[in-house]
């Protein structure tokens, strides 16, 4: 195919720019992110919601062993999409950083500070020869000074703060859905509801409590926790009921 | 003649009278004279015959010599000057100044094709014909496909017919409204959805000359040959107005231009540029409609997609349920199908399949019936065929890949 020949020479080395200023290996790493299932983050005034798709390939697989949601510190959680093993490395790094902060300053690490140190780490793998970039993106959610914060990291080492964001497969559709439906005044429950509906968008099979993971960082308590499968299921049921109701309304009209 | 013949048998008896002897001799003389005359005639005939054979011999030996001679070269006349003609040989592109007989000179003009011998003198003028390869692309025998053989693509077919048929049937309509008829349609869509089939139907249903070719035929080894073929192709089309040119798999030559330095790519691109200028360039295109088909729409160069070249970009999608049912009916027309076969159900059951897939199911179903030693194809056969095809097309399990990602 045309166009590939010239590209090939520049995607061999991670440290080599193409003539139009692109780092092909980093762009390929983003493709690895798209291979992962979707992870969604929604920030509300009451806290940050992380929802991940952890649909299992086999009914015999233990759902709890699918690593999509990670607790970083008491007040910080993360959702990943892409290369699982790479995600673990970054999560370990982030945990270490937050512990270093506690030992050094005796205070919980700021979410922005944590994100920056993680992305600095990621960035090194785009500038040093002999290595490859991280094939994973993270959503880092936490509370900083009572304020909920939501950051996204990218294989290039860029970080952005978001009100609501999706990473992983089908990202475009989900992000579009979030942009249409997001409201700044959502409660945490509304946030979970919104994220689950976004995840449901463009999925063929129905959501189930086992198939999703929900993590919440509560602004009041400043703690991160993950919902159990039956809790998630009740949120899903609520959505389905609401959908049925609106269907019924349609029928009546 | 003083030949004397001894011992001549005289036609009389010695005893006869003088008078009788004389008469007999006279009689003999006249017979001999007659014979002589006859012999002379035969001699003449033989001479003539001899001449004829002599000539034939000469002709044959001449021909024999000619056959042994080296063939003539083809060249194009570049220029006619007082000193002779400047010719350029085909192939090696060598130019030469050469002599031309006055007789030939009168008929020659710059651009004529001529045959030259070993010493490069012009032997004779050749027909100024377009490339043979372009000429053979004209379709004389219409394919045996009608519009009724196309299932489901009603909108697409209507658009194609509007572009191709309407301007020929009713050119006044366009004049009255004051628009130029659309000149080209590009059919694009996944494989097996009937793009070429539509073109075939158009070919058999219109009276216009139909010229078909595959994009890959335009790719040639030598620089300029592909472009020449494109030029000749449109020349052939112009000579046979109104005409429809169908280019199948146009992505072979019309893919996006890049900065690639490979000379092969560059040549393909030059061929495309010739196509661009033929389609909507400086020269009037004439009454020629163009249909092209591709399944790599994303690869096409933007220049070829602009209005004026392809006015209509028609997507040919996978058929919907109704379309599939129609396609089932079309492909089973000649089949001995049991009454119990429900095409509606089959169509509903075969989501995401293309027209070609449906055809494959019908063929497979027939095979199942044959294997079962039946001549009637039943619903069960169709279902088995569908399952078989499903298995064939199932992608390799991606579980190992997904294991790495979450």
Swiss-Prot record, chain A:
<dbReference type="InterPro" id="IPR029055">
    <property type="entry name" value="Ntn_hydrolases_N"/>
</dbReference>
<dbReference type="GO" id="GO:0010498">
    <property type="term" value="P:proteasomal protein catabolic process"/>
</dbReference>
<dbReference type="InterPro" id="IPR023332">
    <property type="entry name" value="Proteasome_alpha-type"/>
</dbReference>
<feature type="compositionally biased region" description="Acidic residues">
    <location>
        <begin position="237"/>
        <end position="253"/>
    </location>
</feature>
<protein>
    <recommendedName>
        <fullName>Proteasome subunit alpha</fullName>
    </recommendedName>
</protein>
<dbReference type="InterPro" id="IPR001353">
    <property type="entry name" value="Proteasome_sua/b"/>
</dbReference>
<dbReference type="Pfam" id="PF00227">
    <property type="entry name" value="Proteasome"/>
</dbReference>
<feature type="region of interest" description="Disordered">
    <location>
        <begin position="229"/>
        <end position="253"/>
    </location>
</feature>
<comment type="similarity">
    <text>Belongs to the peptidase T1A family.</text>
</comment>
<dbReference type="InterPro" id="IPR050115">
    <property type="entry name" value="Proteasome_alpha"/>
</dbReference>
<dbReference type="GO" id="GO:0005737">
    <property type="term" value="C:cytoplasm"/>
</dbReference>
<dbReference type="InterPro" id="IPR019982">
    <property type="entry name" value="Proteasome_asu_arc"/>
</dbReference>
<dbReference type="InterPro" id="IPR000426">
    <property type="entry name" value="Proteasome_asu_N"/>
</dbReference>
<keyword id="KW-0647">Proteasome</keyword>
<dbReference type="GO" id="GO:0004298">
    <property type="term" value="F:threonine-type endopeptidase activity"/>
</dbReference>
<dbReference type="GO" id="GO:0019773">
    <property type="term" value="C:proteasome core complex, alpha-subunit complex"/>
</dbReference>
<comment type="subunit">
    <text>The 20S proteasome core is composed of 14 alpha and 14 beta subunits that assemble into four stacked heptameric rings, resulting in a barrel-shaped structure. The two inner rings, each composed of seven catalytic beta subunits, are sandwiched by two outer rings, each composed of seven alpha subunits. The catalytic chamber with the active sites is on the inside of the barrel. Has a gated structure, the ends of the cylinder being occluded by the N-termini of the alpha-subunits. Is capped at one or both ends by the proteasome regulatory ATPase, PAN.</text>
</comment>
<comment type="function">
    <text>Component of the proteasome core, a large protease complex with broad specificity involved in protein degradation.</text>
</comment>
<dbReference type="GO" id="GO:0006511">
    <property type="term" value="P:ubiquitin-dependent protein catabolic process"/>
</dbReference>
<keyword id="KW-0963">Cytoplasm</keyword>
<dbReference type="Pfam" id="PF10584">
    <property type="entry name" value="Proteasome_A_N"/>
</dbReference>
Curated annotation (Swiss-Prot), chain B:
<feature type="binding site">
    <location>
        <begin position="192"/>
        <end position="197"/>
    </location>
    <ligand>
        <name>ATP</name>
    </ligand>
</feature>
<keyword id="KW-0647">Proteasome</keyword>
<dbReference type="InterPro" id="IPR003593">
    <property type="entry name" value="AAA+_ATPase"/>
</dbReference>
<dbReference type="GO" id="GO:0008540">
    <property type="term" value="C:proteasome regulatory particle, base subcomplex"/>
</dbReference>
<feature type="binding site">
    <location>
        <position position="331"/>
    </location>
    <ligand>
        <name>ATP</name>
    </ligand>
</feature>
<feature type="region of interest" description="Docks into pockets in the proteasome alpha-ring to cause gate opening">
    <location>
        <begin position="404"/>
        <end position="406"/>
    </location>
</feature>
<feature type="region of interest" description="Disordered">
    <location>
        <begin position="1"/>
        <end position="20"/>
    </location>
</feature>
<dbReference type="GO" id="GO:0036402">
    <property type="term" value="F:proteasome-activating activity"/>
</dbReference>
<dbReference type="InterPro" id="IPR003959">
    <property type="entry name" value="ATPase_AAA_core"/>
</dbReference>
<dbReference type="GO" id="GO:0005737">
    <property type="term" value="C:cytoplasm"/>
</dbReference>
<feature type="region of interest" description="Disordered">
    <location>
        <begin position="385"/>
        <end position="406"/>
    </location>
</feature>
<dbReference type="InterPro" id="IPR023501">
    <property type="entry name" value="Nucleotidase_PAN"/>
</dbReference>
<comment type="similarity">
    <text>Belongs to the AAA ATPase family.</text>
</comment>
<dbReference type="GO" id="GO:0016887">
    <property type="term" value="F:ATP hydrolysis activity"/>
</dbReference>
<dbReference type="Pfam" id="PF00004">
    <property type="entry name" value="AAA"/>
</dbReference>
<comment type="function">
    <text>ATPase which is responsible for recognizing, binding, unfolding and translocation of substrate proteins into the archaeal 20S proteasome core particle. Is essential for opening the gate of the 20S proteasome via an interaction with its C-terminus, thereby allowing substrate entry and access to the site of proteolysis. Thus, the C-termini of the proteasomal ATPase function like a 'key in a lock' to induce gate opening and therefore regulate proteolysis.</text>
</comment>
<feature type="coiled-coil region">
    <location>
        <begin position="12"/>
        <end position="70"/>
    </location>
</feature>
<keyword id="KW-0547">Nucleotide-binding</keyword>
<dbReference type="Pfam" id="PF16450">
    <property type="entry name" value="Prot_ATP_ID_OB_C"/>
</dbReference>
<dbReference type="InterPro" id="IPR003960">
    <property type="entry name" value="ATPase_AAA_CS"/>
</dbReference>
<comment type="subunit">
    <text>Homohexamer. The hexameric complex has a two-ring architecture resembling a top hat that caps the 20S proteasome core at one or both ends. Upon ATP-binding, the C-terminus of PAN interacts with the alpha-rings of the proteasome core by binding to the intersubunit pockets.</text>
</comment>
<dbReference type="InterPro" id="IPR012340">
    <property type="entry name" value="NA-bd_OB-fold"/>
</dbReference>
């Amino acid at each position: 195919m045309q166009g590939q020949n010239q590209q090939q020479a520049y995607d061999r080395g991670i440290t080599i720019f193409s003539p139009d200023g692109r780092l092909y290996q980093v762009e390929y790493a983003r493709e690895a992110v798209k291979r992962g299932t979707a992870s969604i983050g929604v920030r509300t005034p009451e806290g940050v919601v992380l929802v991940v798709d952890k649909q299992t390939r086999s009914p015999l697989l233990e759902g709890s062993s699918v690593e999509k949601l990670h607790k970083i510190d008491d007040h910080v959680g993360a959702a990943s999409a892409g290369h699982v093993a790479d995600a673990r490395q970054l999560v370990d790094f982030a945990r270490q950083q937050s512990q270093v902060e506690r030992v050094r300053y005796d205070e919980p690490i700021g979410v922005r500070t944590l994100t920056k140190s993680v992305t600095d780490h990621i960035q090194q793998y785009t500038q040093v020869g002999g290595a490859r970039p991280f094939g994973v993106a993270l959503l880092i959610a936490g509370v900083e000074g009572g304020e909920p914060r939501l950051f996204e990291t990218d294989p290039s080492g860029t970080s952005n703060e978001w009100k609501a964001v999706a990473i992983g497969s089908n990202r475009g559709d989900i992000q579009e859905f979030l942009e249409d439906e997001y409201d700044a005044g959502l409660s945490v429950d509304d946030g979970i509801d919104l994220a689950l509906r976004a995840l449901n968008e463009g999925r063929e099979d129905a959501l189930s409590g086992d198939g999703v993971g929900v993590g919440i960082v509560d602004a009041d308590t400043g703690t991160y926790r993950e919902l159990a499968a039956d809790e998630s299921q009740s949120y899903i049921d609520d959505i389905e009921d609401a959908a049925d109701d609106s269907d019924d309304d349609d029928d009546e009209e | 003649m003083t030949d004397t013949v001894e011992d001549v048998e005289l036609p009389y008896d010695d005893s006869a009278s003088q008078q009788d002897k004389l008469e007999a001799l006279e009689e003999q003389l006249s017979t001999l004279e007659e014979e002589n005359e006859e012999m002379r005639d035969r001699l003449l005939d033989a001479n003539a015959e001899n001449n004829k054979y002599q000539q034939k011999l000469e002709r044959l030996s001449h021909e024999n010599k000619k056959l042994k001679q080296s063939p003539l070269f083809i060249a194009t006349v570049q220029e006619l000057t007082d000193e002779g003609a400047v010719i350029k040989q085909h192939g090696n592109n060598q130019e030469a100044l050469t002599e031309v007989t006055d007789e030939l000179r009168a008929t020659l003009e710059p651009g004529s094709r001529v045959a030259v011998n070993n010493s490069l003198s012009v032997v004779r003028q050749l027909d100024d014909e377009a490339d043979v390869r372009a000429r053979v692309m004209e379709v004389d025998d219409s394919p045996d496909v009608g519009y009724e053989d196309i299932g489901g693509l009603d909108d697409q077919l209507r658009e194609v017919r509007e572009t191709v048929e309407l301007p020929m049937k009713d050119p006044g309509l366009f004049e009255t409204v004051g628009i130029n008829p659309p000149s080209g349609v590009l059919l694009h869509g996944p494989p097996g959805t009937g793009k070429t089939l539509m073109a075939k139907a158009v070919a058999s249903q219109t009276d216009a000359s139909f010229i078909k070719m595959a994009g890959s035929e335009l790719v040639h080894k030598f620089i300029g040959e592909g472009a020449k073929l494109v030029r000749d192709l449109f020349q052939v089309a112009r000579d046979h107005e109104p005409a429809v040119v169908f280019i199948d798999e146009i992505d072979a030559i019309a893919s996006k231009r890049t900065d690639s330095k490979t000379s092969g790519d560059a040549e393909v691109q030059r061929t495309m540029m010739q196509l661009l200028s033929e389609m909507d360039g400086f020269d009037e295109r004439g009454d020629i409609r163009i249909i092209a088909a591709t399944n790599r729409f994303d690869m096409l160069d933007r220049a070829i997609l602009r209005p004026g070249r392809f006015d209509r970009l028609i997507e040919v999608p996978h058929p919907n349920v109704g379309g599939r049912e129609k396609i089932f009916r079309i492909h089973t027309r000649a089949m001995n199908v049991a009454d119990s076969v429900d095409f509606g159900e089959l169509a509903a059951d075969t989501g995401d399949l293309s027209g070609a897939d449906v055809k494959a199911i019908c063929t497979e179903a027939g095979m199942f019936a044959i294997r079962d030693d039946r001549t009637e194809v039943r619903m069960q056969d169709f279902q088995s065929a569908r399952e078989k095809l499903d298995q064939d097309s199932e992608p390799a399990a991606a579980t190992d890949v997904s294991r790495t990602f979450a």
